[in-house]
C-alpha cells in the first residue's frame, strides 16, 4: 500500500505528515495532477471545492498506477466572499483587487479533502471564517510586491506574511493553510478501517 498526495504544495506536504503521524510508519509520495478547475454552471462553492478535491485525487490515482495499492489524497481550497469565489490571482492587479475586497471584512475559507483507492472515494469539507483587519492601499501594494499572494486562493497566505492581516479566525487554521488536520486524520483512519474489513 502506498499513500499518495496529489499536490505539489509544500504546505500540504507538511500538513499531511502531521495528520498521519499516528498511523504506523506513515509515508507518502507526491504527484502533481493537472485538472480543469473551471466552475460548472450553477455549481455552489461547496460542491465546486469538493468536486475539485475528488478530481485531484482521481487524477493523482491515474498517475500512481505503477505504485503498489495506491491510496490518493486530493485537496482544494477556495475563498468565498459574498457568495463569490476568490481563486488564485491572475496578476498583481487581481491580487490587489481581492485584498481590497477582503479588507475589514469576514470571509469563508472552504477546504475539501478526498481520498480514493480506485474502488471507493471518501471526502470531507471544512469551512472556516476568517476576518481581516482594515488594510491601507500601501499595505496591499507592499504585500503584493512580495509575490506571496500570487499562488494562493484569495491572494493571501495565513501561514506567511498574510497572517498579519488576520484579526480573527473561527474554525480550522490548518484548513486555511490548505489541509484540515482533523478531517484528514478521520479520512485516513476510515480508509484504513475499510481496507481492514475487506
Swiss-Prot record:
Catalytic activity: dTTP + H2O = dTMP + diphosphate + H(+); UTP + H2O = UMP + diphosphate + H(+)
CDD domains, A to Z: Maf (cd00555)
Top-level lineage group: Bacteria
GO MF term (any one): dTTP diphosphatase activity
Active-site residues, record numbering mapped to chain: 76 (proton acceptor)
Record keywords, A-Z: Cytoplasm, Hydrolase, Nucleotide metabolism
GO BP annotation list: nucleotide metabolic process
Coiled coil location: none
Major subcellular site: cytoplasm
Site (Important for substrate specificity): 11, 77, 159
Subcellular location: Cytoplasm
GO CC, alphabetical: cytoplasm
Cofactor: a divalent metal cation
EC code(s) of this entry: 3.6.1.9
Pfam family, one: Maf
Keyword Transmembrane attached: no
Keyword Cytoplasm: yes
Family assignment from sequence similarity: Belongs to the Maf family. YhdE subfamily.
Function field: Nucleoside triphosphate pyrophosphatase that hydrolyzes dTTP and UTP. May have a dual role in cell division arrest and in preventing the incorporation of modified nucleotides into cellular nucleic acids.
Protein name, per record: dTTP/UTP pyrophosphatase
Organism, as annotated: Shewanella denitrificans (strain OS217 / ATCC BAA-1090 / DSM 15013)
Amino acid at each position: 500500500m502506498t499513500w499518495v498526495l496529489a499536490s505539489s504544495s509544500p504546505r500540504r506536504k507538511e500538513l499531511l505528515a502531521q495528520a498521519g503521524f499516528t498511523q504506523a510508519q506513515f509515508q507518502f509520495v507526491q504527484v502533481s495532477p493537472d485538472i480543469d478547475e473551471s466552475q460548472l454552471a450553477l455549481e455552489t462553492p461547496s460542491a465546486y471545492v469538493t468536486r475539485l478535491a475528488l478530481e485531484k485525487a482521481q487524477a493523482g490515482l491515474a498517475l500512481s498506477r505503477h505504485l503498489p495499492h495506491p491510496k490518493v489524497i486530493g485537496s482544494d481550497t477556495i475563498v468565498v466572499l459574498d457568495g463569490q469565489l476568490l481563486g488564485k490571482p491572475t496578476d498583481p492587479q487581481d491580487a490587489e483587487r481581492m485584498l481590497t475586497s477582503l479588507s475589514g471584512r469576514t470571509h469563508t475559507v472552504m477546504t475539501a479533502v478526498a481520498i480514493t483507492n480506485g474502488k471507493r472515494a471518501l471526502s470531507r469539507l471544512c469551512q472556516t471564517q476568517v476576518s481581516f483587519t482594515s488594510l491601507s492601499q500601501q499595505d496591499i501594494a507592499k504585500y503584493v510586491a512580495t509575490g506571496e499572494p500570487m499562488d494562493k486562493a484569495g491572494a493571501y497566505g495565513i501561514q506567511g506574511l498574510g497572517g498579519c492581516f488576520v484579526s480573527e479566525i473561527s474554525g480550522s487554521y490548518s484548513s486555511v493553510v490548505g489541509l484540515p488536520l482533523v478531517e484528514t486524520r478521520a479520512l485516513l483512519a476510515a480508509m484504513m478501517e475499510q481496507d481492514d474489513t475487506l
